[in-house]
Curated annotation (Swiss-Prot):
Localization, UniProt: Mitochondrion inner membrane
Name of the protein described by the UniProt record: Cytochrome b
Cofactor list: heme b
Binding residues annotated for heme b b562, in chain numbering: H83, H182
A single MF term (Gene Ontology): ubiquinol-cytochrome-c reductase activity
Biological source species: Raphicerus sharpei (Sharpe's grysbok)
């Protein structure tokens, strides 16, 4: 009798995706982040579901309901902090996953890469709306400032902002719709993740060398299932260290003050994972220019396949490109730091230089380096 996992219509899908899937024999720990993102998503949906059972999406009671969850609900505090810090872990894994894709040239799988970029935008939208829900000072002012950026769009901008707000300011209607979107988007993300996997399994995984590994494949189970379990344990360990020892490390103290439209916090800033884009936004004095740069800072990922000039796929054997890649990483860390600082000298000029550096590295220096490396190969 044939094994049920190979014949049953549902089990067959699982089998072909996670058990008998042919995988390259040389993929490193950088290939663990896909499964870690899946775990993060499941964790966020589960903790979010339990939080939604006690949360009220109303300006009068939202802040109190979060306090109630932390104080009165059984293990509510741990669910709340797992959800908040789970978002940070999600973005750490996302940045590592995207960075891996850039380094090893995974963007040459066009469909997989483009679905991935859509996933990144969807996750950023979800995280932004989630940050508004506790209705603290930074929730309210963050929502006001970020949504207000859309007013920079010519002609339709102001109407668009008022349409999103459901009125003339961020108020009850805004909070209710943000909660609705924050609840539905993770399920859309889950569906997109399946499409992402579907496209990936059409081509098979990339590997550190960037060379076809068709002649050297191994089954996903047990080799990579056990490797993914180790990654998952390390992820959960890191998350629980954050939750149990320093739950507010990555949060903002201003969010423990209830939202007050009459009192603006001294430094309005988003969560840490948006600071790089926020720094790019602030580095341009013009409002529309800043918004365009903000969107382009992430949308530039779509251009990566077009900017790939090298004859080799991966950066494994390209030392000049490697140097530029790590300079880009350092530049992004600099932007993240600047995004959290007040808008004053010397932070303004550092932010402007880091922003110029960011776009120059991706659009000019990396393609030029690839061309130089191609010529060096001829020698």
């Amino acid at each position: 009798m044939t094994n049920i996992r190979k014949t049953h219509p549902l089990m067959k899908i699982v089998n072909n995706a996670f058990i008998d899937l042919p995988a390259p024999s040389n993929i490193s720990s950088w290939w663990n982040f896909g499964s870690l993102l899946g775990i993060c998503l499941i964790l966020q949906i589960l903790t979010g579901l339990f939080l939604a059972m006690h949360y009220t999406a109303d300006t009068a009671t939202a802040f109190s309901s979060v306090t109630h969850i932390c104080r009165d609900v059984n293990y509510g505090w741990i669910i709340r902090y797992m959800h908040a810090n789970g978002a940070s872990m999600f973005f750490i894994c996302l940045f590592m996953h995207v960075g891996r894709g850039l380094y090893y040239g995974s963007y040459t799988f066009l469909e997989t890469w483009n679905v991935g970029v859509i996933l990144l935008f969807a996750t950023m939208a979800t995280a932004f709306m989630g940050y508004v829900l506790p209705w603290g000072q930074m929730s309210f002012w963050g929502a006001t400032v970020i949504t207000n950026l859309l007013s920079a769009i010519p002609y339709i901008g102001t109407d668009l902002v008022e349409w999103i707000w459901g009125g003339f300011s961020v108020h009850k209607a805004t909070l209710t719709r943000f909660f609705a979107f924050h609840f539905i988007l993770p399920f859309i993300i889950a569906a997109l993740a399946m499409v992402h996997l579907l496209f990936l399994h059409e081509t098979g995984s990339n590997n550190p060398t960037g060379i076809s590994s068709d002649m050297d494949k191994i089954p996903f189970h047990p080799y990579y299932t056990i490797k993914d379990i180790l990654g998952a344990l390390l992820l959960i360990l890191t998350l629980m260290l954050l939750v149990l020892f320093v739950p507010d490390l990555l949060g903002d103290p201003d969010n423990y003050t209830p939202a007050n439209p009459l009192n603006t916090p001294p430094h309005i800033k988003p969560e840490w994972y948006f600071l790089f884009a926020y720094a790019i936004l602030l580095s341009i004095p013009n409002k529309l220019g800043g918004v365009l740069a903000l969107v382009l800072s992430v949308l530039i990922l779509v251009l990566m396949p077009l900017l790939h000039m090298s004859k080799q796929r991966s950066m494994m054997f390209r030392p000049i490109s490697q140097c530029l890649f790590w300079i880009l990483v350092a530049d992004l860390l600099t932007l993240t730091w600047i995004g959290g600082q007040p808008v004053e000298h010397p932070y303004i000029i550092i932010g402007q230089l880091a922003s110029i550096m960011y776009f120059t590295l991706i659009l000019v220096l990396m393609p030029v380096a690839s061309t130089i490396e191609n010529n060096l190969l001829k020698w």
